[in-house]
């Protein structure tokens, strides 16, 4: 089975979950004994302030408090910018809309996603999303909370500096930490070593990690993921006679999640009579459509990306190649024994079993063991929640004062 290498329990974090700082009360005082004046500190009333964990993904930004088992908020990573030509003179409405602000607006909007294949390309939009998270979604004062931010594999090092500039300069947070998404994912499995196979909405990675050290020189990347699978499903449905457009992608996304799966043996599925495959799906307007082989054919692009026009290898091939590169460094056996699936795209029904089968065929002598945690869709955020809760981690927060004194060196020395 794909899950024979069962994920470890998360365990109990040391210290107070998510405690990033405290605020003392004002009732400390002096007692005069007559013979001598002694400093007597009464027990201080302390308000614990939890750290905030933010995982900015290509489809959603997941956020919540450290110490929680799952994120509390899922904010769309797509923002809406008002078209300048549609604004009247003296119009004081917000120029950028985020989250629920995008609903029920009659103003023409240009939809923008600040990430392209997992890499930030529009920092102004990132700032708008974070502003919405702090002020509207979580309703907190950012200057009262430390923040842990995830960073994609192979992203430019300048990303971490930009995160710090925004968090400290714009939002005035007291402390922050930036760390690898892959490292956080492996923590969600209760491990520090393994081969993280991540596939979200905009990009896929295969990342070897040994004893908490990410190995970027051995990391693989593919510019296809869940969003491409959705587009391919729309192509297949249109070839079957439907007329979906990009305006219907949210509907296609829902069809993918509710109706589609990865076939263990696709050639056997192709041999089934149509009635065994067909399911009806009701569109928002009440119209019923019937979906047949498209249900499993769409997921084949993860194994054969050429079906969707990509020249990159499939996810199992990408993983096998990464395992091969681990041979020279002596990590191969450890990596093969701990192949960890992460990200929303891997949540497709049947994907773990099919991935295990394909990887075993590509690496017959390595006995790869694939693990698929039930909550792997939010593995990055969950790992961040665990990390920010550990007592041993508290010394790795970069304070605002440190950043002001040392600049980027403060970030690189702790993150």
From Swiss-Prot:
Record localization: Cytoplasm, Cytoskeleton
Cited InterPro entries: Actin, ATPase_NBD
CDD domains linked to this entry: ASKHA_NBD_ACTL7 (cd10214)
Positions of the UniProt region annotated as Disordered: 1-35
Main location, first listed in the record: cytoplasm
Top-rank taxon, per record: Eukaryota
Family note: Belongs to the actin family.
Protein name as annotated: Actin-like protein 7B
Encoding gene (name): ACTL7B
């Amino acid at each position: 089975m794909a899950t024979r290498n069962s994920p470890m329990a998360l365990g109990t974090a040391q210290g107070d979950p998510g405690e990033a700082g405290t605020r003392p009360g004002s009732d400390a005082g002096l007692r005069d004994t007559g013979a001598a004046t002694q400093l007597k500190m009464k027990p201080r009333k302390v308000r614990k302030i939890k750290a905030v964990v933010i995982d900015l993904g290509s489809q959603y930004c997941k956020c919540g408090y450290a110490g929680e088992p799952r994120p509390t908020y899922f904010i769309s990573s797509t923002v809406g910018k008002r078209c300048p030509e549609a604004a009247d003179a003296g119009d004081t409405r917000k120029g950028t809309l985020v989250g629920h602000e995008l609903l029920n607006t009659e103003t023409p909007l240009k939809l923008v996603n600040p990430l392209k294949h997992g890499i930030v390309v529009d920092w102004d939009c990132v700032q708008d999303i974070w502003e919405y998270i702090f002020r509207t979604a979580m309703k907190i004062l950012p200057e009262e909370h430390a923040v842990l931010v995830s960073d994609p594999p192979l992203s430019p090092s300048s990303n971490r500096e930009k995160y710090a500039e925004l968090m400290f300069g714009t939002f005035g947070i007291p402390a922050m930490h930036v760390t690898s998404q892959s490292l956080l994912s492996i923590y969600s499995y209760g491990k520090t070593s393994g081969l993280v196979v991540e596939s979200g909405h905009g990009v896929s990675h295969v990342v070897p990690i040994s004893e908490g050290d990410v190995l970027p020189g051995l990391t693989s990347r593919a510019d296809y993921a869940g969003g491409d699978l959705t587009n391919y499903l729309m192509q297949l449905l249109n070839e079957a006679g439907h007329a979906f457009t990009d305006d219907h992608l949210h509907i296609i996304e829902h069809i993918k999640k509710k109706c589609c799966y990865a076939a263990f043996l696709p050639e056997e599925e192709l041999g089934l009579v149509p009635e065994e495959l067909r399911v009806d799906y009701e569109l928002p307007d009440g119209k019923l459509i019937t979906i047949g082989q498209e249900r499993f054919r769409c997921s084949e692009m993860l194994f054969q990306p050429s079906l969707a026009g990509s020249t990159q290898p499939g996810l199992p091939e990408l993983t096998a190649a990464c395992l091969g590169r681990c041979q020279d460094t002596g990590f191969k056996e450890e990596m093969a024994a701990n192949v960890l699936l992460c990200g929303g795209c891997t949540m497709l029904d049947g994907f773990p079993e099919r991935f295990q089968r394909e990887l075993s065929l590509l690496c017959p002598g390595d006995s790869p063991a694939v693990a698929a945690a039930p909550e792997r869709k939010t593995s990055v955020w969950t790992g961040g929640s665990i990390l920010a809760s550990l007592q041993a981690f508290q010394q790795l927060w970069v304070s605002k004062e440190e950043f002001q004194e040392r600049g980027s060196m403060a970030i690189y020395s702790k993150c």
